[in-house]
Curated annotation (Swiss-Prot):
This is DNA topoisomerase 4 subunit B. GO terms for cellular component: chromosome. It comes from Staphylococcus aureus (strain MRSA252). ATP binds at residues 7, 47, 74, 114-120, 341. SUPFAM superfamilies: ATPase domain of HSP90 chaperone/DNA topoisomerase II/histidine kinase (SSF55874), Ribosomal protein S5 domain 2-like (SSF54211), Type II DNA topoisomerase (SSF56719). PROSITE patterns: TOPOISOMERASE_II, TOPRIM. The keyword Iron does not apply. Keywords: ATP-binding, DNA-binding, Isomerase, Magnesium, Metal-binding, Nucleotide-binding, Topoisomerase. Topoisomerase IV is essential for chromosome segregation. It relaxes supercoiled DNA. Performs the decatenation events required during the replication of a circular DNA molecule. InterPro entries: DNA_gyrase_B_C, HATPase_C_sf, ParE_type2, Ribosomal_Su5_D2-typ_SF, Ribsml_uS5_D2-typ_fold_subgr, Topo_IIA, Topo_IIA-like_dom_sf, Topo_IIA_B.
Length: 663
């Protein structure tokens, strides 16, 4: 892979300083919550991956140390250890100057996904301390930094070595990451596993040395993205073996793997130089365009589509498709839309992917004739179902059919008085009794109430036309008013927030999961925008005294309960709420609906693959994966009165005081 490129001191280019990083970290790592925290690790890992991507080294070890710091070690060439043309040691330039990287101007890399150097300096700026150890040219070098990037030592030669590579250890700064500086093994695992899937020869080890959390996992996939697709489809009924294509066009390397399952949603994961492009881009467009064109040509050739028939829509062809599209693009062609590298803008990538897929897919379809015919028939059925769903939507939206909508919502929805969609909230409330209290206790101006009476369908297993037949889901679709599935338009939503409010028991949790499954599958932009919430009613009410001296307090956790019991002393009465219906309207407003005092959990999708796999595991047809997951993640000795707040993985937003970076 272009080994003549010279990764040396002079190949590191300096573009600008580091001043703004600590002041505005969100601009560089997205946020200072746990996503931003883990992003620090990815920046350093991506630098190590770049070495492997360009043919140097094949191992990366990531270790969460006992003191909460983290180490990333590779066996690449090792960072340059000489003096940079600016007069400073090159290592110091890499770790203290923003945009000092080996990728700029093609100095050290043909293809690069990490910002190689940008990442290193940003991580240093946001760390309490950072140390780098380099094995290069037979010597071991060491340099340390502290207090957000200031060198605390020069580059020191420590001894001799036969190895090559770089080891970076850092401890995040808790004055920047105020919520937590604790790394989550599972979050890191998903991302590292992804990197291993994308590079066949890469071996990654993840270690956790923290007391009580000791754990180790290895990731190495000889069949690369073929195994990635199998991993994503785990727990689903698949229709064939994974298909893979590789090729090169316009100097861009293209790898594609795909497999159909029996479900109704598509999952396309795209990558550029091993970095996930979660918002897609030109490479994804090229894949979809070629696939749609080739499938339609094939359908006409085998006479499943007649001359008079219109072409199959891409959405119908991709129903039940899981695909991974990975491209490697030379630096001079690489363009992203926006700062976060989440959407590819390189125009040549579209034609490159289109060319490779259009060249290879027809042969695959001819070779697998029986399967191909069944996939075409599947797409035709999807087209028919989509047409039926479209007609149902049009019926619901057209003026002449408004009576049906009014009938559907009659006696159910209690609307907000305001028409301000930027402020209005929709409460989905379990049961009639709680719905009644919510109607009386709400702020009529901006809060709408929709009680859920019947059974909510499990949308993981249902197709769109069946979902429309479920009264509860249909009512939610009409109430939100922004469409559903591929036709969902978030800007048309009648509400800024959708808040799920259920009892704090097993049935309530089940309703939450059913609703979240629906939102994740069919109104995903609403979840991605952070506009779906779970209301958190209190578990306990404590009351003491009478008349003017009467004091009423609420507790959401056992910890809060114990604190209040000590504070109130003897003589209080304690009520354990079993359901929302036990609260009168004033109590429900005060504890669960008042923006000044309520507690909400914002539902967020941090990792698309992880979220999708969890939904399949928990809501799919197969019992065994669900049983194994539950046994691994839940203690069945839990007391009935334990709260969701006791889960350290749940981030809670209290009193509606959202951080600017969380919104």
């Amino acid at each position: 892979m272009n080994k003549q490129n010279n990764y040396s001191d002079d190949s590191i280019q300096v573009l600008e300083g580091l001043e703004a990083v600590r002041k505005r970290p969100g601009m560089y790592i997205g946020s200072t919550d746990k996503r931003g925290l883990h992003h620090l690790v990815y920046e350093i890992v991506d630098n190590s991956v770049d070495e492997v991507l360009n043919g140097y080294g094949n191992e990366i070890d990531v270790t969460i140390n006992k003191d909460g710091s983290i180490s990333i070690e590779d066996n690449g060439r090792g960072m340059p250890t000489g003096i940079h043309k600016s007069g400073k040691p090159t290592v110091e330039v890499i770790f203290t100057v923003l945009h000092a990287g080996g990728k700029f101007g093609q100095g050290g890399y043909k293809t690069s996904g990490g910002l190689h150097g940008v990442g290193a300096s940003v991580v240093n700026a946001l760390s309490e301390w950072l140390e780098v150890e380099i094995h290069r040219d037979g010597n071991i070098y060491h340099q340390s930094f502290k207090n957000g990037g200031s060198p605390s030592s020069g580059l020191v030669k420590k001894g001799k070595t036969k190895k090559t590579g770089t080891k970076v250890t850092f401890k995040p700064d808790d004055t920047i990451f105020k919520a937590s500086t604790s790394f989550n093994f599972d979050v890191l695992s998903e991302r590292l596993q992804e990197s291993a899937f994308l590079l066949k020869n890469l071996k990654i080890t993840l270690n956790d040395l923290r007391s009580g959390k000791e754990r180790q996992e290895h990731y190495h996939y000889e069949e690369g993205i073929k195994e990635f697709v199998s991993y994503v489809n785990e727990g689903k009924e698949v229709l064939h073996d994974v298909a893979t294509f590789s090729g090169e066009a316009n100097g861009i390397e293209v790898d594609v793997a795909f497999q159909y399952n029996d479900q109704y949603s598509e999952s396309i994961l795209s990558f550029v130089n091993n970095v996930r492009t979660k918002d897609g881009g030109t490479h994804e467009v090229g894949f979809k365009t070629a696939m749609t064109r080739v499938f339609n040509d094939y359908a006409r050739r085998i006479n499943e589509l007649k001359t008079k028939d219109k072409n199959l829509d891409g959405n119908d062809i991709r129903e039940g498709l899981t695909a991974v599209v990975s491209v490697r693009i030379p630096e001079e062609l690489l363009q992203f839309e926006g700062q976060t590298k989440s959407k590819l803008g390189t125009s040549e990538a579209r034609s490159a992917v289109d060319s490779v897929v259009a060249d290879k897919l027809p042969f695959y379809l001819e070779e697998k004739g029986q399967l191909s015919k069944s996939l075409v028939k599947k797409a035709i059925k999807a087209q028919q179902a989509r047409e039926a769903a479209r007609k149902a939507r049009e019926d619901a939206r057209s003026g002449k059919k408004n009576k049906r909508k009014d009938t559907l919502l009659s006696g159910k929805l209690t609307p907000a008085q305001s028409k301000n969609t930027d402020k209005n909230e929709l409460y989905l409330v379990e049961g009639d009794s709680a719905g009644g209290s919510a109607k009386l206790g709400r702020d009529r101006k901006f809060q709408a109430i929709l009680p859920l009476r019947g059974k909510v369908i499990n949308t993981e297993k249902a197709r769109l036309e069946d979902i429309f037949k479920n009264e509860e889901i249909n009512t939610i679709i009409h109430t939100i008013g922004a469409g559903v599935g591929t036709d969902f338009k978030i800007e048309d939503s009648n509400y800024n927030r959708v808040i799920i409010m259920t009892d704090a028991d097993t049935d309530g949790a089940h309703i939450q999961v059913l609703l979240l499954t629906f939102f994740f599958k069919y109104m995903k932009p609403l979840v991605q925008a952070g506009r779906v919430f779970i209301a958190l009613p209190p578990l306990y009410k404590l009351e003491k005294g009478k008349g003017k001296t009467k004091r009423v307090e609420y507790a959401w956790t056992d910890e809060e309960l114990n604190k209040l019991q000590k504070e109130l002393g003897k003589g209080f009465t304690l009520q354990r709420y079993k359901g929302l219906g036990e609260m009168n309207p004033e109590q429900l407003w005060e504890t669960t609906m008042n923006p000044e005092t309520r507690t909400l959990i914002r539902v967020q999708v941090e990792d698309e693959v992880r979220s999708s796999k969890r939904v399949t595991t928990l809501m799919g047809d197969k019992v065994q994966p669900r049983r194994e997951w539950i046994e691994k993640h839940f203690e069945f000795g839990m007391q009935e009165d334990q709260s969701i707040l006791d889960n350290s993985e749940v981030q809670v937003l209290e009193n509606d005081q959202f951080d600017e970076e969380e919104i």
